[in-house]
UniProtKB/Swiss-Prot annotation:
It comes from the Eukaryota. The lineage of its organism: Eukaryota, Viridiplantae, Streptophyta, Embryophyta, Tracheophyta. One of its GO terms (biological process) is photosynthesis. PANTHER family: FERREDOXIN-THIOREDOXIN REDUCTASE SUBUNIT A1, CHLOROPLASTIC, FERREDOXIN-THIOREDOXIN REDUCTASE, VARIABLE CHAIN. One of its GO terms (molecular function) is oxidoreductase activity. InterPro entries: Elect_transpt_acc-like_dom_sf, Fd_thioredoxin_Rdtase_alpha, FTRV. It comes from Zea mays (Maize). Heterodimer of subunit A (variable subunit) and subunit B (catalytic subunit). Heterodimeric FTR forms a complex with ferredoxin and thioredoxin. This is Ferredoxin-thioredoxin reductase, variable chain. Variable subunit of the ferredoxin-thioredoxin reductase (FTR), which catalyzes the two-electron reduction of thioredoxins by the electrons provided by reduced ferredoxin.
Amino acid sequence: EVASDDVAAEEAAAAPKIGRRVRVTAPLRVYHVLKAPDLDIQGMEGVVKQYVCVWKGKRVTANFPFKVEFELAVEGQPKPVRFFAHLREDEFEFVDG
C-alpha cells in the first residue's frame, strides 16, 4: 500500500506539468526526425504530453520521464513536422503564456 501511495503522489506531482509549454534549456540533439536528422533542439519550445514514470499504476524506470511534443517548420512542407522527445525535468524550463 505504501508503494501505491508513493506512485499516486508521484503522478499527482507530475499531473500539473502535463499540457504546459516548455523550452529546452540543455544542448540536446535528436536523430529520429526524418525531415531533420541531427536536429539540435536546444531553445525549441514544445508541450509536455505525458509523464512516463508511472504506467498502469506502477512505477517504471524512465531516464527521460517527460514526453514533449514539438513542431518544426521544414522548408517545402506545407505543415510543420511533429515529433516527440523524452526529456528529464532539468533539460527544460516552463514557458508562461
